[in-house]
Design a protein with these regions (language model features):
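Alpha/beta-hydrolase active-site loop
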Residues: 156, 162-218
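Primarily recognizes the serine-hydrolase "nucleophile elbow" in alpha/beta-hydrolase
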Residues: 195-261
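The feature captures the conserved acid-bearing segment of alpha/beta-hydrolase catalytic domains
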Residues: 113-114, 244-305
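Active-site machinery of serine-nucleophile hydrolases
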Residues: 58, 62, 72-92, 133-174, ...
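C-terminal catalytic-base region of ester-bond hydrolases, centering on the histidine
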Residues: 48, 68, 287-355
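Short substrate-entry loop that stabilizes the transition state in hydrolases
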Residues: 99-162, 274-277
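Fungal secretory targeting signals
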Residues: 1-16
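Domain-level recognition of soluble alpha/beta enzyme cores
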Residues: 15-122, 324-334, 345-347, 354
């Protein structure tokens, strides 16, 4: 393809591509935490070790308290794997290694009212097979509007997880049968609850979260997710009373949440005709007994609910190349989509906190 040469010239020579900053009033700090659940054996680990979860925690910080820092969008091993996927589409294999985004390095911990501020906690579960890093821009946007966001990597589900010490866990090639996915959503739901417990631990504030202002508002803990992540959020709500509600972005719902429904608030947000193409949505929606909404976002497809639209926009591709990628990301304006999803999340958190 002709645009392959263009991409090679853009990112093949080490040119960084910085993603635009989000529109919320807060700057955002990010920390990474490897969390070992010593009370669970990982059912997908061939060595039967403890469940080992990795999370990126995005934290709102008042802008005057910040110094700008630029971070790689993906860690090296993850960028390499996704670069191979990009190459199969005619893009440079250095594409994902070139992306970066700005975050806040707190200059000092606010005192007085700022130190006592509490923020809602959003736990975000990715789509099946996806790295948590593929939602980093989205998480940063949510956090910029005053939410703490924890992005989870689910071991042996994500294509690859790269831990801070360089250790990697590759996909376990989990079958996509209904029985297997029901099991996986349960394991993922347990991951969600475990991460909530870890983020609420005072010890984390003395280590990974040290120097960040405010704390978690325990009355405003919500679970969100894309695709299988949304289904996992629904299952987590059934068993974890700390979660006040949840949201599914364009994902099929599985039992037991599908049949039992939920008492708590839940939003379904998806592409046009999702409810016609996926029978679980209408069934689940009918079984929701709390505040509920089914929201359609025009000109989106399943892949729109990741960072792909914003990443492709940042590449500034020729019109012909952008058109070729539209079936994967939709035709919605990426900036409008990012802002729209953030507004939906903010309204959902308010609905959740009113219960």
């Amino acid at each position: 393809m002709k645009f392959s040469l263009l991409l090679l010239s853009l990112v093949g020579l080490g040119n960084a591509i910085e993603l635009p900053k989000p529109n919320g009033p807060y700057s955002v700090a990010v920390r990474t935490s490897a969390m070992i659940d010593k009370h669970r054996i990982d059912p997908y680990d061939p060595r039967r070790g403890h469940r080992n979860v990795l999370a990126s925690i995005f934290w709102p910080v008042p802008s005057p308290s910040c110094s700008k820092t630029t971070l790689p969008y993906m860690t090296p091993a993850v960028a390499k794997l996704y670069g191979q996927k990009a190459q199969s589409m005619g893009l440079s294999n250095e594409t994902f290694a070139a992306f970066e985004y700005s975050v806040c390095t707190p200059l000092h911990t606010p005192k007085g009212c700022g130190s006592k501020r509490q923020f809602p906690l959003i736990i975000f579960s990715p789509g099946a097979g996806n790295s948590r890093l593929l939602y980093s821009n989205m998480a940063r946007s949510f956090a910029s509007f005053g939410n703490i966001v924890a992005l989870i990597d689910h071991p042996y589900d994500a294509d690859i997880i790269e831990f801070p010490d360089g250790k990697t866990i590759m996909t376990g090639n989990i079958p996509e049968t209904t029985k297997s996915l029901i099991k996986l959503t349960k394991v993922r739901a347990e991951d969600i609850s475990f991460v909530i417990s870890e983020v609420l631990q005072s010890s984390l504030y003395k280590s990974v979260l040290k120097g960040l202002p405010g704390s978690v508002d325990k009355s405003k803990i919500v679970a969100l997710g894309h695709s299988l992540g949304g289904a996992s959020a629904a299952v987590a709500i059934l068993s974890d009373k700390r979660i006040c509600g949840g949201m599914d972005m364009d994902g099929q719902i599985f039992d037991p949440a599908l049949s039992q429904g939920l008492e708590k608030p839940f939003f379904l947000v998806g592409r046009p005709n999702h409810s016609k193409e996926d029978a679980t949505w209408n069934k689940f929606f009918a079984n929701l007994r709390g505040s509920k909404k089914m929201i359609t976002i025009d000109r989106t497809v399943h892949g729109s609910f990741t960072d792909y639209p914003q990443l492709i926009q940042a590449l500034n591709l020729p019109a012909s190349a952008s058109k070729a990628i539209q079936p994967l990301i939709g035709t919605v304006n990426p900036s409008d989509l990012e802002n729209g999803l953030s507004k939906i999340v903010v309204s959902f958190v308010k609905a959740c906190s009113n219960i």
